[in-house]
Amino acid sequence: VNTNRDSEGLGGSDPCCNLCSTAYLVDVIHHEQINATFANSVSSRFPKDESYLVAVSGGRDSMALLHFLQSTGYQNLVLCHVNHCLRGAESDADQALVEEAAKSLGLPCEVHSSDVAAHAAASSQSIEAAAREIRYRFFSDVASASNCKQLILAHHADDQVETVLINFFRGSGSRGISGMDQISQRVVNQVELTLIRPFLNLSREAIDRYVSKHDISFREDESNAEEFALRNRIRNRLIPTLAEVFERDIQPAVLRSAELAHRAEQWARNQEAELPRKENGLDVSSLRNMPDALRDRLLLAWLRESGIPDCGFSEVAKITEILISESKPAKTNLPGNHHARRRAGILFLEFPDAEGENPK
């Protein structure tokens, strides 16, 4: 599967795109050689003498990723593993495998253990959301300590399909339906990470063949077959049902839709530079005079660049309500004990103090 994205240096004739190019990855996987053009293009964007963090769970995909990176000459790797403490001895065995792999390769390995279930309960989040939050906080901590801000992840095309479907049924706009980018930026705890997903255009089947061919050791997460997690239900129930209803593999169509949404998203991102900034916020009059669709996009971009967690168009709607209101100064609540306030013709954000209270 090749979605041939042409933004952020990921497609078209840009020679820097090939780290994430399906054609080159397939060449590596099936021919056991690195094409000279591939090697040169990788070095031009992601030099092999730089350091990279690699998220390694011990599962099939991340162990294949680790093998791939090593076989293509990436030696300055820091393995990052999170023990979610969800599966008892099984979680500990995952950690042991990753640590053993790091030792055998002579690579540093950073490990973090966290009671994800307890964190989920305390923060009123799903297990999936809590685990993701813990992982990225850990990644940002390692990135800050090691001064290495490039993180390589093992997401593949099947993961992309699941992500697109989840976002679609949540009512996401083009940003959500476009799925994950092969190369993107994410700010966590004021640390800007560059996320790199070399396998995003490869199917799970292709990775399975690679693992089998190279006899790569990995741990099978049996919880992937359980249905408590939304992503598992999407993978195990919804996708097979859709394939049966449409009598075809739905992956190409979903990825094609994601690509079209990505192009629309690309245009919208170009408009985000037009944020009507004023003092420490945004100019209310300018926002009121914008077309609704553009204003929604700009407000969402503003929230995300400001580090407001878990924000979407529902938060944008709340801000729009106080924005267009003719009442005196108005305020609305946002996730993470943040607030948006309109006062004296300026829309601005209030942030919690170190204790998470008393927004300032």
Task: Say what each PLM segment does.
Residues Y24-R237:
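Core alpha/beta nucleotide-donor-binding catalytic domains of modification enzymes
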Residues A143-A157, P252-R269:
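Electropositive, surface-exposed helix/loop patches at the edges of structured domains
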Residues T241-A253:
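Inter-helical turn/loop segments and adjacent helix faces that build the functional surface
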Residues S124, E128, Q251, F313-V316:
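Short, structured helix-loop boundary elements
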Residues S146-C148, V245, D310:
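Surface-exposed helix-capping loop/turn segments at secondary-structure junctions
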Residues N2-L10, D14-S62, V78-H84, S114-V116, ...:
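AMP-forming adenylation/ATP pyrophosphatase catalytic core
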